[in-house]
Regions:
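Extracellular/lumenal inter-transmembrane loop segments of multi-pass membrane transporters
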Residues: 119-130, 159-174
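Accessory cap/linker subdomain of secreted extracellular hydrolases
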Residues: 1-19, 28, 37-107, 111, ...
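Extracellular/periplasmic catalytic domains that process cell-envelope and extracellular macromolecules
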Residues: 29-32, 132-135, 174-178
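Amphipathic alpha-helical interaction motifs in eukaryotic regulatory proteins
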Residues: 110-117, 155-159
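Caspase-like (clan CD) cysteine peptidase catalytic core
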Residues: 24
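Gly/Ala-rich beta-loop-alpha elbow adjacent to hydrolase catalytic centers
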Residues: 40, 143, 147, 151
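Short glycine-enriched nucleophile-adjacent loop
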Residues: 148-163, 182
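C-terminal or late-domain output modules
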Residues: 147, 168-181
Length: 329
């Protein structure tokens, strides 16, 4: 929903003079040039869910996505303002009930597209008026941020499924989902490379801001390239995946532990680069600049939930998904 309401969708949420929310068309939405399908994934993100659980959330004291901070449904305390305390319905919050690897998420997305394009053939780009056959569905996949990693993996899986369909490994009745374009927006492509780039940018950029000194830069890059550092562990992780978990099912504990260690090491490798008092997305600006999140309040209105047929409130961030991925990266 971030992409739909804050970035490229056909409309955006605005606050009216009376404090209510409504939508208005986005002038440069991507729907000007294409049909767009936004997918909430992995399970328990956005409007996707496994089970429906009724809970109460205090947004002041709790981390709402955390399973440990959920409370049984209860009345709002008298000293707590209405905006801060909400009763709602959410996914289970269980890490065992979501995809814990990008390869598994790729499979889930392929099966979703199979179901969606079959159930709604008029949205299938492979359906042509006056024809009885369905041509290959030529789609354009765009992914952002971590999409720099999952986008290529999704693309590879779609093509592998097409090959399996051709050689008879899977039924011919499966739709051929042909990838026309893979687009990556502000993508995270490679952790060691990103860590080095962040440190270099923090030390030397065209805006004249410098928030790491030469010693921090040199120590950071040396640590990244050292034995047992970010780069070394990332390479060990890749080698272990290739030999012990080539299908990406996440069922080799030694590989999971090694890759989790690599992730943690790389996350902290360039940490000095992110200790900056300005916006990480636009270092000219203080504080953080970006589209507002009013769409969350809009989507969580009872009338909107009823209109779109969602049994759960929207969840912009899922602790269950993050914990599952961190445990088996």
């Amino acid at each position: 929903m971030v992409g739909l309401f804050q970035e490229t969708g056909p409309c955006k949420v605005v606050q009216n003079s009376d404090g209510t929310y409504s939508t208005q068309p986005r002038v440069w939405g991507w729907d000007r040039s294409s049909n767009i399908l936004f997918i909430d994934q992995p399970t328990q993100v956005g409007f996707s869910y496994d089970e429906c659980v009724n809970v109460s959330v205090d947004f002041e004291n709790d981390n709402p996505p955390s399973l440990a901070n959920r409370r049984p449904p209860s009345a709002r305390p008298a000293d707590v303002p209405d905006w801060r305390f909400k009763n709602g319905t959410f996914a289970s919050g269980l890490t065992s009930n979501t995809e814990d690897l990008t390869e598994i998420a790729a499979r889930a997305s392929w099966h979703f597209l199979q179901g969606f394009l079959s159930a709604f053939p008029h949205y299938n780009p492979g359906v042509r008026p006056g024809r009885t056959s369905v041509e290959p569905s030529d789609i354009n996949l765009f992914a952002e941020s971590y999409g720099g990693t999952y986008g290529p993996i999704f693309a590879d899986f779609y093509e592998e499924q097409n090959d399996r369909r051709k050689n008879g490994t899977i039924p011919k009745s499966a739709l051929e989902i042909r990838l026309g374009t893979l687009g990556i927006v502000n993508g995270m492509l490679d952790l060691p490379t990103a860590a080095v780039a962040a440190l270099n940018y923090a030390y030397n950029n065209t805006y004249g801001y410098h928030w790491v000194d030469l010693t921090q830069l040199q120590n950071g890059i040396s640590g990244i390239n050292a034995e047992g550092g970010c780069k070394d562990l990332a390479n060990q992780c890749r080698a272990s995946v290739a030999s012990s978990d080539p299908e990406g099912f996440g069922n080799d504990e030694a590989t999971n532990n090694l890759c989790a260690r690599a992730l943690l090491t790389c996350t902290y490798a360039g940490i000095d680069a992110y200790h900056f008092p300005k916006s990480l997305y636009d270092i000219r600006v203080t504080p953080e600049a970006g589209p507002g999140a009013s769409y969350l309040e809009y989507l969580n209105q009872a009338k909107v939930l009823q209109a779109i047929g969602s049994p759960v409130n929207i969840t912009s961030y899922s602790a269950a998904v993050q914990d599952a991925y961190n445990a088996s990266t």
